[in-house]
């Protein structure tokens, strides 16, 4: 029959694996449409295809207690009892989150306390969102790590009573389980180590090397340079100045006025030079004396006439 457990199935927690689900809920599952149409004749390989089609998790819902496909596949896995390696691959699957949730619930129902902590605690680092259907048939939003936390600490998940789980600290004291290290602690350790490395690098940069000390030594006998030459202020060019930098500045008209010599001044200077050159030459003195003392005949006639008129 379709509702019987396989012959070579092992008892779990001293009982038939299907009996881990309550009889009322188990009966509702056997009578559901999904169980009769989709779960008939399924094997461990075919369960994977059905698990990939899941879109939400949940137990039973509605007034007449209808089971969800997630709950039906859970009971089917208890019935066929797949190998542990297949369940571990379900849990490690990162592409399909509902396949992972199905494997986690089955591991919690059938696995030992050590296996539950070993395979389920790493899923605390999965923060993906999943849909959950409540008793009223409404969908709620939750995360993968919340679902894992309920599996490890709650008594009932998806309307299934979970087996008792041994406390973690008891297993740690018995040295059967190592203390759990969360991903947050690992990140904090990485941050602290990186900060320590940065501080060490800064200290090494602050400590001057012997070469630097030799360079910084100053001879007291040598005269000290003026601070203006040493600490020369660099002019910061504005964008406007940068644009004008390739072109050379034209001299201001005021400077040009001082530099340029006026023609009048130039003439006077040239005359002085000529006069000096003539005064130095001996011929110039003679000609000058001759011009100053000797009179022309016309000029002498005019002076003679003027003297005559004065006498008359």
Swiss-Prot record:
Q: Where is the composition biased (Acidic residues)?
A: 184-202
GO biological process terms held by the UniProt record: mRNA splicing, via spliceosome
Identify the main location.
nucleus
Per the record, what is one GO cellular component?
precatalytic spliceosome
- Intracellular or extracellular location(s): Nucleus
Task: Give a single Pfam family match.
Answer: PRP38
In the UniProt record, does the keyword Acetylation occur?
no
Positions modified as Phosphoserine?
11, 193-194, 209, 226
Q: Which domain of life is it from?
A: Eukaryota
Indicate, by first and last residue, each region the UniProt record lists as having compositional bias (Basic residues).
225-294, 301-312
Q: Which GO terms describe its molecular function?
A: RNA binding
Chain spans, region Disordered: 181-312
Extract the ranges annotated as region (N-terminal protein interaction domain).
1-179
As recorded in UniProt, coiled-coil segments are 170-204
Keyword match Nucleus = yes
Q: Which family does it belong to?
A: Belongs to the PRP38 family.
Q: What is the role of the protein in this entry?
A: Involved in pre-mRNA splicing as a component of the spliceosome.
Can you state the subunit structure given in the record?
Component of the spliceosome B complex. Interacts (via N-terminal interaction domain) with ZMAT2 and MFAP1.
Q: This chain belongs to which protein, by name? A: Pre-mRNA-splicing factor 38A
Q: Which organism is it from?
A: Homo sapiens (Human)
